Each structure stands twice: as structure tokens, then as C-alpha cells.
A protein has these predicted regions:
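N-terminal, positively charged regions that mediate nucleic acid binding
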Residues: 1-40, 44-58
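Structural motif
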Residues: 15-23, 114-121, 254-258
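Short, hydrophobic/amphipathic alpha-helical patches that form generic packing surfaces
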Residues: 24-32, 123-131, 265
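Short acidic, hydrophobic short linear motifs in intrinsically disordered regions
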Residues: 36-41, 139-141, 274-276
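DNA-contacting interfaces and partner/effector-binding or oligomerization modules
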Residues: 45, 52, 57-76, 83-207
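Flexible, glycine/charged-enriched surface loops at secondary-structure junctions
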Residues: 170-172, 275, 308-309
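Extended mid-to-C-terminal alpha-helical interaction segments
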Residues: 196-288, 293-298
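Short, Lys/Arg-enriched C-terminal cap helix and immediately downstream tail that follows
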Residues: 300-310
Length: 311
């Protein structure tokens, strides 16, 4: 089961007993389906939970004659599509008009009379998500969207979302394949919206996943930093060893000044040791910068005096 399906399952488990709240939820489901008119009501979904929720709401509120169909989404897939159809046209007309829409009305807008309180708005948005909402797996990305069939409805939905007082939401929009997408990519806003419409468990799951990602990223950054440092140490050490070997072959290490001679022998014995550790292991310990300064002098000696004395 996908994360989006889990969200819809949780939303469908919300207990609601007030008739107006049930009606607002049903309104959200029907209005944002692609077939809601005075002559035809058809609801298609991949979620069996959403399909059964719609049937429950219709039967409790209007008792229409309903047919539920089920079919495989594709021949090569195990996922199914569920279609709930209100059979009788008189039932369609009765339901359509009860939500304040006029018989034969083609262009639908959100009738705000059905969203007269915060509780009704919550129920309405719960229905909208069950109808056209989806959310990505938080392990992959943060993305929640509503795929809205009409431009006017997408604009109305954005307004409803933006006016929620319990959380601050800033929906974005884009047109995709003839549909109007209202979406969120900020994890905080997604969690707030899920909690608002009745899916706090999934909201907590997203927050937990985000925390795990942050820990992993911090660990990876630390590991990458350590690997990079090891690489730098190895490169610098190889350069120093080459210079010392060159001195050894030409004028001899014992010809070096005492401070350079000591660190040269220590480097030969400890090719993987960091500059900090080299400095601490000298007869008179010095800092990392002090050890680095001696190594730079050693490299300069190998590049200048060795060439002169080695002719």
C-alpha cells in the first residue's frame, strides 16, 4: 500500500456524527470528482477506502440507488479502480440541488454556504483530498497535491486553503495534462494540512522521516569530510615523502638542520600520520601549524638547495 493510500485510509477512519459535517465531506468528494451534475454522479478512485466512504456518506444522507464497479487499472497491474455510480437521475438532481447548485449548471464553483464553519471546512477538505488528492512517499520527496478538473475550482480551493486559521498554508498551482494542480512542497505545510484534515499519524510519520533524513545527511557530510581530509593528508604526505627521499638520495637527511632532520625521519617512519600528530610526537612538541611550517621548509629545501648541491 502506498503512503497516499495510507493517508486516505486514516482520513476515512475519522469518526463524524454531525449531519452537516458529513454533508460537507460528501460535497468535497463529489464537487472535485469529474462527474458531478444534476444528471450524472460518478466517482472513480484507486482507494477502496475512499469508495466505501462515499457509499457510506451517500446512504446516510440521501439513500440513493448506488452501483459499485471494480476493475483492474491495467492488464499488467494488480491495482484496481473503483467506480461508484448514482443510478437514478432523480437522485442526482436531488443531491446536486441540495448542495445549492442549479439544475443544468455546467460551470461549478465552491458553494461557500456549505463551508460556514471551521469544522465544516475541515470536513470539506477531507472530502476533497479523498476525491482528487495524493501525496508522495516522504522517503523520496515532500509533495502533496490536488488534481482539480476545472480552473475555477482550483482557484476556489486555493482560497479555501489560504483562509484556514489553524495553520498557514501557501498553495501553489500548475497546469498539467489539462488538469489544474494545487500543490505543496514544504514538509511543514504538508504536515499541518494532513493534521487539519484528520491524518495526524501520517503527519507524524513525515516529521519522523524528515528527522531521520537530517541525521543521515549530517552523518554523510561528516563521513565525506573525513574522507576528504584523509585524501588531503595522503596527498600531502606523499609529496613530503617524495621530497625526503629526494634529499636522502642526493645530500642525505643528516645534512638537514636539526629541526628538519627530526621531522623528516618521523615522517619516513609514519607516512600516514597527520601534521598535528607529527608535531605532537617530536622531541619538543609543536602545533599543527608549526609542523606544517617545517614541512614547507623541507619542501623548499628539496626544491632549491638539493638541486644546487646535487649537481
Amino acid at each position: 500500500m502506498s503512503f497516499s493510500s495510507d493517508v486516505k485510509k486514516e482520513i476515512c477512519s475519522v469518526e463524524q456524527f454531525e449531519r452537516e459535517a458529513l454533508k460537507a465531506e460528501l460535497y468535497g468528494m463529489l464537487l472535485f470528482s469529474r462527474n458531478f451534475s444534476s444528471k450524472k454522479i460518478t466517482f472513480t478512485t484507486e482507494s477502496n477506502y475512499a469508495g466505501n466512504r462515499l457509499i457510506f456518506l451517500l446512504q446516510n444522507l440521501y439513500m440513493p440507488i448506488i452501483e459499485k464497479q471494480s476493475a483492474l487499472r491495467t492488464k499488467s497491474s494488480d491495482s484496481r479502480l473503483y467506480k461508484i455510480i448514482v443510478i437514478d437521475e432523480n437522485d442526482c438532481k436531488r443531491i446536486f440541488e441540495d448542495f445549492g447548485h442549479i439544475y443544468g449548471q455546467v460551470t461549478l464553483r465552491v458553494n461557500r454556504a456549505n463551508l460556514s464553519s471551521e469544522e465544516l471546512t475541515q470536513s470539506f477538505l477531507r472530502g476533497v483530498f479523498l476525491s482528487c488528492g495524493s501525496i508522495s512517499d516522504p522517503m523520496k520527496s515532500y509533495h502533496l497535491e490536488f488534481c482539480v478538473p476545472h480552473k475555477n475550482l482550483s482557484q476556489d480551493l486555493c482560497k479555501v486553503l489560504s483562509e484556514i486559521t489553524e495553520c498557514t498554508l501557501a498553495p501553489k498551482t500548475v497546469v498539467r495534462s489539462g488538469s489544474y494542480i494545487v500543490y505543496f512542497k514544504e514538509s511543514e505545510q504538508i504536515c499541518d494540512l494532513l493534521t487539519y484534515i484528520g491524518a495526524p499519524i501520517r503527519a507524524m510519520e513525515i516529521m519522523g522521516t524528515k528527522a531521520i533524513k537530517q541525521v543521515r545527511n549530517n552523518v554523510n557530510r561528516r563521513i565525506n569530510g573525513e574522507v576528504a581530509n584523509i585524501g588531503k593528508i595522503a596527498t600531502a604526505s606523499a609529496k613530503q615523502l617524495d621530497a625526503i627521499e629526494h634529499i636522502k638520495r642526493t645530500v642525505g637527511i643528516d645534512s638537514l638542520p636539526e629541526d628538519l632532520r627530526e621531522i623528516a625521519y618521523l615522517r619516513l617512519e609514519n607516512p600516514d600520520m597527520s601534521l598535528r600528530d607529527l608535531g605532537q610526537n617530536l622531541s619538543t612538541p609543536i602545533s599543527r601549524s608549526g609542523a606544517n611550517h617545517r614541512m614547507q621548509r623541507l619542501l623548499e629545501y628539496a626544491g632549491t638547495e638539493v638541486k644546487t648541491n646535487g649537481k
